Amino acid sequence: IDQNGADILRLWVVSSDYYSDLRIGPEIIKRMTDNYRRFRNTLRYLLGALDGYSDMEAVDYDTMPQLEKWILNQLAELDVKIRAMTEEYDFHGIFTELHSLCNSDLSAFYFEIRKDTLYCDAVDSVERRACRTVMKQLFDRLTAWLAPILCFTAEEAWQNWVGDSENSVHLRSYDPIPSNWKNNSIAVRWDGIRRVRQVVMSALENARNDGKIGASLQAAPIVHV
């Protein structure tokens, strides 16, 4: 605990199959530290992207681009799972779902796509405002979902946002998800887009390994579907 902090130990517990014998050692703790950084870096990225955000900037759901609607659909589906797993005290399942969200859906996909929108679009553009609206929803829900697992980290992130020690993340409940966030047609469409993207990314990686390109931006893929 002195070296890595209590949240690393808590993360080790929830990431383990506690129906079997638990193993711990330097390599396992190192792996937990890497997992922890994924959560912490996600929260830190969201806080940075939301600098100066206010509710006046928020965009209605119907005005949002489809990518933002897909993220909200992901949150709606995840909310159902997490509520059910919380009732069963299945914190291992919650850890698995949240790590997949932060690693696959956000870091490797949504954040990667929307960084140009955040950095380059006009501050009052609909796309940028929609992106920050969704990121605020991500931050609110991630801090609440992570609070039982990474209690100190979630509180630190939440206090960085609210700046009120009396308003603890541990006094919050899971906010209800608006019914219109669940959108099966958008989910199917973007699942297909992600599969195509994975094929393209694999081809780009092969081209880099063969020395044909140095960076992805040097390529001009042609996709046949």
Positions of predicted regions on the chain:
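Membrane-interfacial loop-to-helix junctions in multi-pass inner-membrane proteins
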Residues: 24-32, 90, 127-135
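Acidic, turn-prone loop/beta-hairpin segments
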Residues: 53-83, 111-203, 207-224
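Short alpha-helical scaffolding segments that buttress acidic/His motifs in well-ordered protein cores
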Residues: 8-16, 43-46, 98-102, 110, ...
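Catalytic adenosine-cofactor/nucleotide-binding cores of aminoacyl-tRNA synthetases and other
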Residues: 1-64, 162-165, 212-213
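Secretory-pathway/luminal and periplasmic proteins that interact with or process carbohydrate-rich
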Residues: 20-22, 107-111
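Conserved structural-core and active-site-/substrate-pathway-adjacent residues in large, well-folded domains
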Residues: 5, 39, 105-106, 146, ...
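Short helix-adjacent coil turns
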Residues: 86-93
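Generic structural concept
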Residues: 33-36, 40, 72, 76, ...
